[in-house]
Amino acid sequence: MSSLLLFNDKSRALQADIVAVQSQVVYGSVGNSIAVPAIKQNGLNVFAVPTVLLSNTPHYDTFYGGAIPDEWFSGYLRALQERDALRQLRAVTTGYMGTASQIKILAEWLTALRKDHPDLLIMVDPVIGDIDSGIYVKPDLPEAYRQYLLPLAQGITPNIFELEILTGKNCRDLDSAIAAAKSLLSDTLKWVVITSASGNEENQEMLVVVVTADSVNVISHSRVKTDLKGTGDLFCAQLISGLLKGKALNDAVHRAGLRVLEVMRYTQQHESDELILPPLAEA
């Protein structure tokens, strides 16, 4: 094995601004398959750690793949430190997780990582389900999020359904959703961005609500009728990119929403069932 060892000079190691931990597909534009190119468009470096590796989303007539084994998953995380590739790390984002054990492994890694990176921004998209589909992850994941990842996160981006699951509160009107989000805030968890609050259906409006201890900001966007998948993953990629580029939270959320709308319309114009990223006007 020693004869195969070529690269041992850690001063030459690639560095990343972001580690993105979520699903990956061979075909399609969800999870890291859309987040990584979106982050790179913003001029940031990212390492992608897969939680599941799938042929495509389950919305096609064939579907292959599954969750990454725990041994592999923990090894992927450990290898980033063994390569000394995290010296400039600024943020870790999480999306779709394959198993509750992955969440625990990730939390242990993040806890250790924060000792060397006390200012690390941890943003969690607690992917659990939605109003139309219900829970579409394994049933032990919501509790794993509550127990392991929420205590480490500075910000989370649940939809209404996920907010209800995490808090046990009804969130179908704006005031109750805001109250539920506030109940999650802590010394560590500084903000909740609700990505699908109730808007005006007649006016084709959708709301994104930014909740902090001191303020509530309701951002309205046009609703685009579509079955496109991966829009939430794209939103989170744009949001973390905006924050790392120095945008204030409300501005970063607003810009992320506008970018998602732009990508959705561009994709529709090109008659694709998978998101297509147009060039980014402002890198």
Curated annotation (Swiss-Prot):
A GO term, aspect molecular function: hydroxymethylpyrimidine kinase activity
Enzymatic reactions: pyridoxal + ATP = pyridoxal 5'-phosphate + ADP + H(+); pyridoxine + ATP = pyridoxine 5'-phosphate + ADP + H(+); pyridoxamine + ATP = pyridoxamine 5'-phosphate + ADP + H(+)
Cofactor: Mg(2+)
Entry binding sites for ATP: 125, 157, 162, 195, 221-224, 231
GO cellular component: cytosol
Binding site for substrate: 23, 59, 233
Protein's GO biological process: pyridoxal 5'-phosphate salvage
Transmembrane segments: none
Binding site for Mg(2+): 136, 162
Assembly behavior: Homodimer.
Chain's role: B6-vitamer kinase involved in the salvage pathway of pyridoxal 5'-phosphate (PLP). Catalyzes the phosphorylation of pyridoxine (PN), pyridoxal (PL), and pyridoxamine (PM), forming their respective 5'-phosphorylated esters, i.e. PNP, PLP and PMP.
Family listed: Belongs to the pyridoxine kinase family. PdxK subfamily.
Stated name of the protein: Pyridoxine/pyridoxal/pyridoxamine kinase
Species classification: Bacteria, Pseudomonadati, Pseudomonadota, Gammaproteobacteria, Enterobacterales
